[in-house]
Amino acid sequence: MLSGFANGTIWLIAIAMFLSRAVIKTGLGKRIALYFVGRFGKKMMGVAYGMALADVVIGPGIPSASARGGGIMYPIMQSIADAYESKPGPTARRAGAFLAIAVSQIDTIICTMFLTAMAGNPLIAELAKSQGVEITWMTWFLGAIVPGIVSLIVLPYFVYLIY
């Protein structure tokens, strides 16, 4: 009944959740994101790439897509959209719709790039281990880095073409 608590993966997820809450509460994630947006945010494409870089930096340490995307990236994206006077309705296409789609898709890419970027990834590694396949953080990263970087480069441009 309590055998699940003996699984190290469950404890890794629990501790990472506590750390992600600390990053949100202290505002560290927000400061990291605003740093990258400030460096690259001269145009809307730069803002999207800045948000992507911020997500790459905080992604390995926050194993929850909802905590990272909804707790850190979304409020920043919303503030940027407000600064461009982009609100739901007729002005949504000014910045808000583009940023909302780009940030949510970027968060999905980050979840696949790092073993610790999503709570389910360590469970996948544990399942693979039970079948005799060892997946370490580095093997996951090396397998996902090239498609992840290509996706992060292409995605904002593709979304920009649509909007």
Where do the PLM segments sit?
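Membrane-embedded alpha-helical segments and adjacent helix-loop junctions characteristic
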Residues: 1-88
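Juxtamembrane and boundary regions of transmembrane helices in multi-pass small-molecule transporters
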Residues: 65-69, 84-163
